Design a protein with these regions (language model features):
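Membrane-embedded alpha-helical bundles that constitute the cytochrome b-like, heme-associated redox core
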Residues: 1-113
Length: 113
């Protein structure tokens, strides 16, 4: 894939993940507000996440979108502010994105399984 195509694909991925994150944040906030106003404790909320297959899937997708979005954003910041480009920068940012995804998925697993 050419450099121009790679940049275009990353640009699209950044915008798509931003759109997904907006939806995920709205659902998360609405759910938390509804649960707290309904008098649910943290323990009761966790019990409900354990009983559903939808919540782990929702939060796993949320984490993956955030990790991808964050990694692409860090790559852009490194290039624009630090002048750090090339394979080394790409590999470092990819490793950070994978680490963020792994930590986030571990957190999802911890509260839903």
């Amino acid at each position: 894939m050419s450099a121009a195509r790679t940049e275009a694909a990353l640009w699209v991925a950044q915008r798509v993940t931003a759109l997904l994150l907006a939806g995920f944040v709205l659902v998360h906030l609405a759910t938390m507000i509804y649960a707290v106003r309904g008098g649910l404790s943290a323990q009761a909320m966790l019990a409900r996440t354990h009983a559903s297959a939808a919540w782990p899937a929702f939060y796993a997708l949320f984490v993956l979108a955030a990790a991808i979005h964050g990694a692409i954003g860090l790559r852009t910041v490194a290039a624009e502010w630090l002048g750090w480009r090339g394979r080394g920068a790409n590999a470092t940012v990819a490793a950070l994105g994978l680490a963020l995804a792994a930590l986030g998925l571990r957190a999802v697993w911890a509260v839903t399984v």
